[in-house]
Amino acid sequence: NVSSEAAIVYNASKKEVVFEKNAHIKKLTASICKVVTALTALENLNKSNYLIISDEMVNVEGSRIYLEVGDIISIETLIYGLLLRSGNDAAKALALAYNNNEADFVYKMNELVKKYNLKNTIFNNPSGLDEDTKNYSTCYDLAILTSVALKNETFSKIFKTKKYSCTLPN
């Protein structure tokens, strides 16, 4: 008996749905969209590169990793902050690290979704914060995207991490 409105159990190795309840109903993604943000960053940015944090990157709502203007931080460390702390500032920084343009990064997120022929998912921003129902997906699409992400060695390593700390070079 599942009390949630929508749910899925997906066997990624067999590419098989074991259980589903309303798995194709569109819902707001909220922070689960950060799985796609992380995968998009890993596919389009060099995780070893460093980024200087700008004012635009720190002015975000919601959960944060508390970046400060002038911080110098690696792409990989930002992905840790994105996935472990659900850092909206990390999401914004990663998006702006791609062509210095959040819209270009979000376009890449949506291209990633299309690559797997998932027609019920669309992103409008990299954080999942959404007041206008523009970031949506389904349990099914998110199960597929998460199984794809877990095949990425760096994503899988970060996703399994229980505790992470870093020292910034500045």
Give residue ranges: language-model regions.
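Active-site-adjacent loops and short helices of periplasmic peptidoglycan-processing enzymes
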Residues: N1-E153
